[in-house]
């Protein structure tokens, strides 16, 4: 996750986030959907973020990319639902992953860490996100969980 203020963040970082978060999802779906449509079933579970539902300071490009994943997932769901293909979205809140090791804007990283500390320093365990994905996957083909938002109980945003 490449955090930064739109006034000074390198546009190359914007492109990297769009390529990964939006085009990566598009490419992945384009690869797997033809076979799912042909066999009339299958699940696609896309990963987004709560940043795809609300804004966060110093997250402009990241937020834009995750809003894109939300819109893309819902649009494709509408396109393939008649073919019995399930498109689901998981939108985690702050989680303990390596994503923040890529932040190049120290001020943005500091702001994130202050926000995290204001919530007691606790964020979502990645295992909880994985359990959520498995829960969606294990649903019968006749049930499509369109979206799940998941965050640590103490996350205030």
Locations of regions flagged by a protein language model:
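Substrate-binding pocket helix/loop in short-chain dehydrogenase/reductase
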Residues: 5-6, 10-15
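Active-site loop immediately N-terminal to the catalytic Tyr-X3-Lys motif
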Residues: 7, 54-60
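Active-site helix of classical SDR
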Residues: 29, 65
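Alpha-helical segment proximal to the catalytic Tyr-Lys
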Residues: 34, 78-81
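Residue(s) in the substrate-gating loop at a strand-loop-helix junction
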Residues: 49
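C-terminal helical subdomain
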Residues: 89-90, 109-157
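Short, flexible catalytic-loop segment of classical short-chain dehydrogenase/reductase
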Residues: 92-102
């Amino acid at each position: 996750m490449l955090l930064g203020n739109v006034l000074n963040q390198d546009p190359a970082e914007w492109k990297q986030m769009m390529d990964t978060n939006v085009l990566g999802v598009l490419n992945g779906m384009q690869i797997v959907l033809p076979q799912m449509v042909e066999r009339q079933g299958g699940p696609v579970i896309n990963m987004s973020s709560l940043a795809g539902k609300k804004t966060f300071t110093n997250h402009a490009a990241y937020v834009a990319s995750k809003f894109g994943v939300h819109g893309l997932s819902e649009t494709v769901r509408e396109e393939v639902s008649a073919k019995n293909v399930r498109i689901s979205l998981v939108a985690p809140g702050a989680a303990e992953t390596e994503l923040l090791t890529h932040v190049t804007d120290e001020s943005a990283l500091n702001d994130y860490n202050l926000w995290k500390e204001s919530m007691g320093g606790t964020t979502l365990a990645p295992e909880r996100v994985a359990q959520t994905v498995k829960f969606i996957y294990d649903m019968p083909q006749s049930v499509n969980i369109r979206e799940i938002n998941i965050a640590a109980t103490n996350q205030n945003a």
